[in-house]
Amino acid sequence: MEFPIGSLETNNFRRFTPESLVEIEKQIAAKQGTKKAREKHREQKDQEEKPRPQLDLKACNQLPKFYGELPAELIGEPLEDLDPFYSTHRTFMVLNKGRTISRFSATRALWLFSPFNLIRRTAIKVSVHSWFSLFITVTILVNCVCMTRTDLPEKIEYVFTVIYTFEALIKILARGFCLNEFTYLRDPWNWLDFSVITLAYVGTAIDLRGISGLRTFRVLRALKTVSVIPGLKVIVGALIHSVKKLADVTILTIFCLSVFALVGLQLFKGNLKNKCVKNDMAVNETTNYSSHRKPDIYINKRGTSDPLLCGNGSDSGHCPDGYICLKTSDNPDFNYTSFDSFAWAFLSLFRLMTQDSWERLYQQTLRTSGKIYMIFFVLVIFLGSFYLVNLILAVVTMAYEEQNQATTDEIEAKEKKFQEALEMLRKEQEVLAALGIDTTSLHSHNGSPLTSKNASERRHRIKPRVSEGSTEDNKSPRSDPYNQRRMSFLGLASGKRRASHGSVFHFRSPGRDISLPEGVTDDGVFPGDHESHRGSLLLGGGAGQQGPLPRSPLPQPSNPDSRHGEDEHQPPPTSELAPGAVDVSAFDAGQKKTFLSAEYLDEPFRAQRAMSVVSIITSVLEELEESEQKCPPCLTSLSQKYLIWDCCPMWVKLKTILFGLVTDPFAELTITLCIVVNTIFMAMEHHGMSPTFEAMLQIGNIVFTIFFTAEMVFKIIAFDPYYYFQKKWNIFDCIIVTVSLLELGVAKKGSLSVLRSFRLLRVFKLAKSWPTLNTLIKIIGNSVGALGNLTIILAIIVFVFALVGKQLLGENYRNNRKNISAPHEDWPRWHMHDFFHSFLIVFRILCGEWIENMWACMEVGQKSICLILFLTVMVLGNLVVLNLFIALLLNSFSADNLTAPEDDGEVNNLQVALARIQVFGHRTKQALCSFFSRSCPFPQPKAEPELVVKLPLSSSKAENHIAANTARGSSGGLQAPRGPRDEHSDFIANPTVWVSVPIAEGESDLDDLEDDGGEDAQSFQQEVIPKGQQEQLQQVERCGDHLTPRSPGTGTSSEDLAPSLGETWKDESVPQVPAEGVDDTSSSEGSTVDCLDPEEILRKIPELADDLEEPDDCFTEGCIRHCPCCKLDTTKSPWDVGWQVRKTCYRIVEHSWFESFIIFMILLSSGSLAFEDYYLDQKPTVKALLEYTDRVFTFIFVFEMLLKWVAYGFKKYFTNAWCWLDFLIVNISLISLTAKILEYSEVAPIKALRTLRALRPLRALSRFEGMRVVVDALVGAIPSIMNVLLVCLIFWLIFSIMGVNLFAGKFWRCINYTDGEFSLVPLSIVNNKSDCKIQNSTGSFFWVNVKVNFDNVAMGYLALLQVATFKGWMDIMYAAVDSREVNMQPKWEDNVYMYLYFVIFIIFGGFFTLNLFVGVIIDNFNQQKKKLGGQDIFMTEEQKKYYNAMKKLGSKKPQKPIPRPLNKFQGFVFDIVTRQAFDITIMVLICLNMITMMVETDDQSEEKTKILGKINQFFVAVFTGECVMKMFALRQYYFTNGWNVFDFIVVVLSIASLIFSAILKSLQSYFSPTLFRVIRLARIGRILRLIRAAKGIRTLLFALMMSLPALFNIGLLLFLVMFIYSIFGMSSFPHVRWEAGIDDMFNFQTFANSMLCLFQITTSAGWDGLLSPILNTGPPYCDPNLPNSNGTRGDCGSPAVGIIFFTTYIIISFLIMVNMYIAVILENFNVATEESTEPLSEDDFDMFYETWEKFDPEATQFITFSALSDFADTLSGPLRIPKPNRNILIQMDLPLVPGDKIHCLDILFAFTKNVLGESGELDSLKANMEEKFMATNLSKSSYEPIATTLRWKQEDISATVIQKAYRSYVLHRSMALSNTPCVPRAEEEAASLPDEGFVAFTANENCVLPDKSETASATSFPPSYESVTRGLSDRVNMRTSSSIQNEDEATSMELIAPGP
């Protein structure tokens, strides 16, 4: 994009006059003329780039500063457009005071007002004025507030309508209405305004109260805020973009849900109507039972008002005695939950997908249909819910990233242009300098219209801003203390940082603390560092980014007070003005000439021009500085004067002492400990504290407050306020201390819990020393910053929908509230009658709970409105906007966010303090050791030579890593071998070696090495160690790592390795010879010891192999050292016999059969645990059998353990984690067995121990590869997960303590317990606790607490977990909202704004922290992939493209098509069946079949059933016919296609189901024939195969297919966890009372029932219901003395066990496993999308081979050259080369074999190359491919290519030339002979020379053709390009093409094909 030179003139801005309009008309006419001319030359037109509008001159943007100052008289006036793009458009621009660009049409507005009309100009001036938009914004906000009120008069509405009308009129007058560009209706935002106004008038004109719908549209006014606030439009753009992207996912979702809904319809229709009815009723009346009309004949489910559902199957729910299960007329939940018709089934499935109270539907369905249908729910939840919902997340994330990328690109484009402009200015300046004009002196020139601010002020600003002690302060004794300890890290600051994506318009992220080392200006450029830094021009000091404008610091006096002194008048050094060498692509010559044109000879003009250049540059710099400046210069100087305290030497001395004290690492440690202790004190508050305890807490609070105040005061004195307040942490401290002091002052007058909660923020001070917390807060900070606009959008959405709900449904809720409110309440909890409650409902929908409110809404209002409103909020708000939130959060995670602390180069003080303590500990230990060793000397073992594998690092970058992680001594040379005892000596002597600076792994420079020098590192490694030995060395290293953890002080010593290498290794002294072929000198800088002789290593390696037949040592070296008797000589008797025994055991243990046997036993013993349920005592035989098998298993496992001890030795056995697990579990079995024999088995701990045997399967699974991968991934993620868990706990601690402050003791209430039902005693009877005691005459009143409450911090955590998972949160919220004071009876919504506490917690505690789990797990996945990822990391993007294309190519080969039958009739059918039209017809029929299945309902008439039955028979007949036809035509080949087999099975099943339903009507109750019909639905999958167009959907399914293996592994692991937990649940909670979520079907009494419960809470659904009965501890909730059937007593739970059981299960399954599931899906979705965007996909190769089959029916893999042109044209997609294509094909230089045939692989390679373009990487990949192809096609014989197409063409042309020459020779000769005077014209033509192109070609070639020997010699498999074309392609120029083109295409067709 050209930079308009004119725009740099000083008179940039010209008024828009009639002349300007005439000029535009001329330009347009000229453009029209050129357009016509251009149409004649079509080809040129394509190549020209169309002009595009300039990015920084878009409407609504601010005009960049370098266009100059805008004169005051031109503000708001029409100006000529600066953007050259609009020079041919009838437009002009207007700038307001803030330099915002507005564009207007220069045509007449409303056909009346020209741009020069006074009225229109006034309107324009008003419309662009900033106050106008401000006024409108304020109006909108006021209007929004008014709309939330119900009590305001109607007239106010008219006022707003008038204001909006006025706004619209002004805009229409200024812009015109709609015909031309930039008119009013051309802006989509104005459509909104216009419709709002129109509807307002319609509503007023037709005064119908009924049209509340029209009044609702007023609400859309709130959306106008979007159009007024600029940043919001971008986010709305992203939203719309993501909604567009969701099209594919939406189709897939609807498709999947429809299929599932159909299955649900077939399986469950009518079932949910089954209820338990009193037995004495007459059966014939049952048809019209309705639970509304006759509630007394039903029995209700305990604790609810819902009738009890039941089923007639054996495994469904049963009725209690006296009741019978009958089908009634209505469904549960106001008749809205059912599968009775397709629509209701679809709604139920959508609810399952969004997982909203799905456990309720799950329980209802299983109760009525049977437990076996859990399978249906497993499929729907895992495939439907997890997969589809997360696909939405994946798509939204991707759309966001694309949008982000686009914005970044735009910014970069702007930046590039800006740099070009500056480059131009710089060149102008050079020219001026050459012409002798002093640019610096021009600063004082008054003539410059642009110099807005005086130079001195600017000079002030150009001084390096004092960020923390600026450059000049170094000289003064007061240099900033913070930076002294940073000085040593200057290297870090200036070294290579990770390239943050810098750009001009980046804003500093809110949480980022930019503090620079001393002597570094804010630009990151060191004084005197004048290298040219390529970087972002406008961004001065981004985070650690080097700015491109190196400024030399100005000479400054050391005293800041005299800053206004002599330097005031110095001209700034030129380096300020000349931006340093900015790296810009050079301008084209044309533009350079402009600078040196004759203008410069004109003296006055030159001066002015120079001035303008200078002032523009300075204004650019000003712009740059303003963006960086923190505060105005006058304030800076004032603050430096008054906030830096240096009054007298005593004071300075005090400062120095305090400085030492405050910066000491131990001070930081003390403060951190104080914060921790203070937090613990705050967390100890609880309900019912004793006065002494309370007093202790109070005193503690005072002490801590004093302590923190002292810390603050000391710091202020030590650092001076000026520097103290430049650190954000210090400001934070200061605020908290001030609030704490305030609270202490106010505490006497009454408790201010608001201020008390401020103290909680102290916890965040931990972030200073805890990097993860810091990072997390930053992530939240960053995303809140990025989310600022999104949050506003979300707020607007919530606001708009809340208002819509209030307007549309408010009245309905008021009038019909009795339908849905509880009997004793006036209002329901959730309603839309007022704005606040309406807002809460919308917020609740955003949390994912919509269905219950929707039922209530449908009960009171119009069903359609409710459905539309709730589903819209759900889809828009929850699925799109909330996922965009998550996308932003995930985006904030960068690779090492959580593992690496901030790399600001600052040593963490805490680490230093801890390191000092460590050193002290080591020294003490050493002193003690030396003291004792003097008194009793130890025998020192002989030092062994070390085996150190050389590090492959030559680069100096490695030094950092080496110094940090391996203590090698500072010399870097060889290290003396030393004994094992000395390993700490160098550390103690020189503690700086590895303790002082623990560099986190993320910061080590090795990462950089991986990034930029991956290949170097590899190649170096290969240089040093020959390839073969490398692997062996790695294996040795791995072995060493595996067996002994290496200490930092040693390499892998031979002693460490000895046990694994057998005895012999130790006895030899191994010579240290450098590796073969490597010189001594090549020893790398950081290595300790050169490599051992590889021969030696190779000799030892076999002994390391897995099938090593020799066992290890029994004992570790430590044992042998301390107890030499353990060292046995196995060569002497009697030990040699023992050795043989060990070898035998070893062989047994290592045998695969032994392993299989043990795994089988493990599975059996695990299975036996499943039988030990609640009813075991009623089955004596089973019990006896289990006891017996238990003993057998125990003995087997003990025997296995003993065998392994003997075989492996203790050392190996006890260093293996899996063996430890075994050991513990065997011990548990032993203990429980012993206890059984001693008759202690009923002791509770022993029973609990026995359940731990369920952990055994873990070991079996360690043998399964897939499972192990998941476990490894999990183990790898554990540190990060624990970190996040800890941070969550800290975050939640604040809310928990706050909850305790707000609600402790306020949840108690008086309840009435009658007939097993609980009810709250009305406030009129009981007011407080004492009333409850007094009124309790009947003994049925109880003063109880809500089970989950905020009485202490631990309970608070449980309550918060329920709120965060949205399970059970309602009861907690209701209790909080109803609470009054301690010991008072609650009152309905007495404390209504407590809802906000929960809203805030859900946003910060729930939303952010729980989604961090997804972030962390995904992050970890990516990191582990990086560690494991092989070639990917070292491949460029280009290489990857080729690699992927080739990968796909390799798996394919040509197949023989099914031969057409010879029989005439069969052939006819074959032609029909193989047509695409036939397939499409079948697809249409499948869809029709699906539709007829949708039509079915539960209560359909007999007639309808019959018709549907007939239709079904018709479809079965059609599909059978299709099947028969295909079998007839395709014969035995029919079964070679998977789809055909599938069809065949479906048809057989369909026929079977028809026969069954016809013969056995009686079987229907057991065996629904419709189930078979469900199978037919699977045929719909065929549609996806056919539609190549449905690429997006196929990508999504492809992602699913890719995810399946991983998901299966995760599922297995999840099953394992469920198994273990269900065994545990069976032993812990079998007898709990049935209430809430536990009943006769869902309980922990049998294994199956436990699994039902655990599957449900895998998604966290309904875990509160299962936990509730377990929290019962005594009356009235349960009876501890109730006898149970198995001999135990009581039906109470054990709260502690229950809470641990459920919280751990929720964390493992819901937070970790399910998030792994999400991570896999997101990952594979990205991969699949990348694959689908690649230029060549699998389909293209499939298509190639499909087309190939037609041209090569015998699958010979060759086609003739003559057929190639047609073949290339027949292909579709990117590989196709349309006709005329002969020239292109010839130039492809394809190898020919005898018979002019070409091999398919050659063609495919050439076509692939044609699509992907030339690339050097093809060669290696091609060779690779050929090998692969040969492997898959063994039939292929080698063949010799004898020529290539290009060679053939050349020979052909040569032949023609020779022929022509010969003909002319013959002609001349005959002429000479006959001596005829005149030559006939035709012969003259024939004799003429060949055309120009060919002559050029032959001259160029010198007519040299390659040797035959050179091409034909290579025999290849199949031929490679090189073998055939080596001699040619290097020499042949593209001139061939001209010769070929010049030849007539027609003649070339007739040419004779070449002979061999």
UniProtKB/Swiss-Prot annotation:
Per the UniProt record, which residue ranges are transmembrane? 126-149, 155-174, 188-206, 213-232, 249-272, 374-399, 660-684, 696-719, 728-747, 754-773, 790-810, 865-890, 1148-1171, 1185-1210, 1217-1238, 1243-1264, 1284-1311, 1392-1418, 1472-1495, 1507-1530, 1537-1560, 1573-1594, 1610-1632, 1698-1722
Q: Where are the II repeats?
A: 647-911
Posttranslational modification: Ubiquitinated by NEDD4L; which promotes its endocytosis. Phosphorylation at Ser-1451 by PKC in a highly conserved cytoplasmic loop slows inactivation of the sodium channel and reduces peak sodium currents.
What is the species listed in this Swiss-Prot or TrEMBL entry?
Answer: Homo sapiens
Of the GO CC terms on this record, one is: plasma membrane
Intramembrane features: residues?
A: 342-366, 835-855, 1354-1375, 1647-1669
* Catalyzed reactions per annotation: Na(+)(in) = Na(+)(out)
Q: Which family does it belong to?
A: Belongs to the sodium channel (TC 1.A.1.10) family. Nav1.8/SCN10A subfamily.
Q: Where is the composition biased (Basic and acidic residues)?
A: 40-54, 561-570
Q: What is the effect of changing residue 916 to W?
A: Found in a renal cell carcinoma sample; somatic mutation
Q: Where are the IV repeats?
A: 1458-1757
Q: Where is this region: Disordered?
A: 27-54, 443-485, 500-580, 963-986, 1041-1089, 1909-1956
- Associated disorder: Episodic pain syndrome, familial, 2: An autosomal dominant neurologic disorder characterized by adult-onset of paroxysmal pain mainly affecting the distal lower extremities.
The lineage, from the top, is: Eukaryota, Metazoa, Chordata, Craniata, Vertebrata
Could you give a single Gene Ontology term from the biological process aspect? odontogenesis of dentin-containing tooth
Spell out where the chain is glycosylated: 284, 288, 312, 335, 819, 1312, 1328, 1336, 1686
Recite the UniProt keywords alphabetically.
Answer: Cell membrane, Disease variant, Disulfide bond, Glycoprotein, Ion channel, Ion transport, Membrane, Phosphoprotein, Repeat, Sodium, Sodium channel, Sodium transport, Transmembrane, Transmembrane helix, Transport, Ubl conjugation, Voltage-gated channel
Tissue expression, as annotated, is: Expressed in the dorsal root ganglia and sciatic nerve.
Compositional bias ranges of the Polar residues kind: 443-454
Topological domain (Cytoplasmic) residues are 1-125, 175-187, 233-248, 400-659, 720-727, 774-789, 891-1147, 1211-1216, 1265-1283, 1419-1471, 1531-1536, 1595-1609, 1723-1956
Q: What is the designated name of this protein? A: Sodium channel protein type 10 subunit alpha
Query: Is-annotated flag, keyword Disulfide bond?
Result: yes
Task: According to the UniProt record, list the residues that bear Phosphoserine.
Answer: 441, 444, 467, 479, 612, 615, 1451
The GO terms describing molecular function are:
transmembrane transporter binding; voltage-gated monoatomic ion channel activity involved in regulation of presynaptic membrane potential; voltage-gated sodium channel activity
Binding partners and assembly: The channel consists of an ion conducting pore forming alpha-subunit regulated by one or more associated auxiliary subunits SCN1B, SCN2B and SCN3B; electrophysiological properties may vary depending on the type of the associated beta subunits. Found in a number of complexes with PRX, DYNLT1 and PDZD2. Interacts with proteins such as FSTL1, PRX, DYNLT1, PDZD2, S100A10 and many others. Interacts with NEDD4 and NEDD4L.
Where is it located?
Cell membrane
State the III repeat positions. Answer: 1140-1449
